[in-house]
């Protein structure tokens, strides 16, 4: 019996991960490439067993990743999937199950975008899940849930972080922040229901939402 040790490289094929969003509710077949993935590489060690000069067994003895696989990430449409990553109370029948302090139905929403480092008039960094309001109606820092009545478009939980002329003059009730100009154009005017949470309920989710904001360093994800 003779043993031989050998090593060979194996490719780790890239995988595709999908991110669901209702952002594309007007173009439901649209897919957006968020990140192009790449194959990884691993080094695999084997022990080969030879009997009377013939290979009779091959046993893997070690596997080490040399290059990590990077998955491809694609964003696509899914009804009722929120645009925002922020969280709040469970949604039941299209609205938060607890803590609603004020409800505004069939309100005119518009869309806007800014630079990745932009901050709203409240001082908060703008991301998906930050919106412009009339702060005399909805105070800065308020947590709210925003959705179309039919659920085909769900912006999700959002914080009042900015204002603008349209909100102050009443030509729009709320301006939803998007991370690209094209997204803001695609979703320019939408009739939405806005459910503003009371401060005690919002406070329950502050720590988790602060962590989500801190982790959100990659536009489009």
Task: Identify the function of each model-found stretch.
Residues 1-101, 138, 211-218:
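Extracellular modular ligand-binding repeats in secreted and cell-surface proteins
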């Amino acid at each position: 019996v003779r043993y031989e040790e050998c090593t060979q490289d194996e490719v780790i094929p890239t995988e595709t991960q999908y991110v669901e969003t209702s952002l594309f509710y007007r173009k439901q077949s649209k897919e957006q490439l968020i990140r192009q993935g790449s194959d990884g590489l691993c080094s695999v060690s084997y022990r080969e067993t030879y009997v009377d000069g013939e290979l009779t067994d091959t046993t893997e003895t070690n596997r080490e990743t040399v290059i990590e696989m990077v998955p491809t990430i694609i964003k696509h449409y899914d009804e009722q999937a929120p645009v925002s990553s922020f969280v709040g109370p469970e949604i039941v029948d299209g609205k938060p199950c607890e803590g609603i302090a004020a409800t505004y139905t069939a309100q005119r929403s518009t869309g806007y975008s800014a630079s990745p480092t932009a901050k709203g008039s409240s001082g908060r960094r703008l991301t998906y899940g930050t919106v412009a309001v009339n702060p005399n109606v909805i105070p800065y820092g308020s947590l709210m849930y925003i959705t179309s009545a039919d659920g085909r478009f769900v912006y999700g939980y959002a914080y009042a972080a900015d204002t603008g002329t349209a909100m102050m003059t009443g030509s729009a009730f709320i301006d939803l922040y998007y991370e690209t100009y094209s997204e803001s154009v695609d979703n320019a005017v939408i009739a939405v229901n806005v459910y503003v949470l009371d401060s005690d309920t919002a406070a329950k989710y502050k720590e988790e939402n602060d962590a989500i904001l801190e982790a959100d360093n990659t536009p489009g994800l």
